[in-house]
Amino acid sequence: TGVAWRIT
């Protein structure tokens, strides 16, 4: 995916 940076 490409949304794992806003879940951090």
Swiss-Prot record:
The keyword Glycoprotein applies. Glycosylated. GO terms for molecular function: carbohydrate binding. Keywords: Antimicrobial, Fruiting body, Fungicide, Glycoprotein, Hemagglutinin, Lectin. Hemagglutinating activity is stable from pH 4 to pH 9 but drops sharply below pH 4 and above pH 9. Disulfide bonds: none annotated. Monomer. Has metal-independent hemagglutinating activity against erythrocytes from human, sheep, goat, rat, rabbit and chicken. Hemagglutinating activity is inhibited by glycoproteins fetuin, asialo-fetuin, fibrinogen, asialo-fibrinogen, thyroglobulin, bovine (BSM) as well as porcine submaxillary mucin and asialo-BSM but not by sugars alpha-L-fucose, D-glucose, D-galactose, D-glucosamine, D-galactosamine, lactose, D-melibiose, D/L-mannose, D-mannosamine, D-raffinose, L-rhamnose, xylose, glacaturonic acid or N-acetylglucosamine. This is Lectin. It comes from Ganoderma lucidum.
